[in-house]
Curated annotation (Swiss-Prot):
Its main location: cytoplasm. Disulfide bonds: none annotated. Required for gamma-tubulin complex recruitment to the centrosome. Belongs to the MOZART1 family. It comes from Xenopus laevis. This is Mitotic-spindle organizing protein 1. Part of the gamma-tubulin complex. InterPro entries: MZT1. GO terms for cellular component: centrosome; cytoplasm; gamma-tubulin ring complex; interphase microtubule organizing center; spindle. Transmembrane segments: none annotated. The gene is mzt1. PANTHER family: MITOTIC-SPINDLE ORGANIZING PROTEIN 1.
Amino acid sequence: MANASGNMSAVRETMDVLLEISRLLNTGLDMETLSICVRLCEQGINPEALSSVIKELRRASDTLKASESTAS
């Protein structure tokens, strides 16, 4: 049981470090999104492809928000 607790602590510490790096790089990723990205990479998703998808989704979201604000 202590080993599982130590493992969870190490995972949490790793995620905290990754989140800090993410903030320093101004990625705009929150803990939940970063965690999803890490899990996808662990499952073999290409990190560069994942980055491209995130950028494209942000562009699409920005475009949608801009069109909604001009329509109202």
